[in-house]
Amino acid sequence: MLDEYPDIVIGCAGGGSNLGGLIAPFMQDKLLGKADPRIIAVEPASCPSFTRGKYAYDFCDTGHVTPLARMYTLGNGFMPAANHAGGLRYHCMSPILSKLYHDGYMEAVSAKQTDVFEAATLFAKVETILPAPESSHAIRGAIDEALKCKETGEAKTILFGLTGTGYFDMSAYEAYHNGTMTNHVPTDEELQIGFDTLPVQPE
């Protein structure tokens, strides 16, 4: 394979399983001081647990069966708006990834649905691979970082996770191309409804 080590590692983020698997070897190097790649999570703007959530103890499920875990969460009662990246519609983030983000070892950004599909369409035209909507969040992040490099004249190796194809998501691509796709970004008031469902912790 390529004899390259990434300067930037980018993955899509919903609950964190895919992202965790992608970044694990690079995060190990970072924690051991062997390398210092930037690690970036890209999540949907409609379900922004990293970028707008709270670092708090919460249930991982809506049935309140799981043990409480400290993580970035929108509250177990938060109901994300419907979007075409169903695999990223989850109210909270992996406790391990949450700790890494909280301690400054990784970054997070959010992306609107139409911006994600713009990136997905470009990728499909250039690489002849139709990416899954979830993967397309990472593609959006990779394109944005590449454009920054173009502006600054820097040469950086960017690794992103392409986790699946979008052949079962043709209706989503159709909605993007015919202009009916919408973006939902929750208001602070909508987020507060979810935060109000966080379990109360004793002092």
Where do the model's predicted regions map?
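Short, well-ordered alpha-helical packing segments
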Residues: 10, 19-27, 39, 174
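C-terminal structured "cap/appendage" subdomains that terminate the fold
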Residues: 124-163
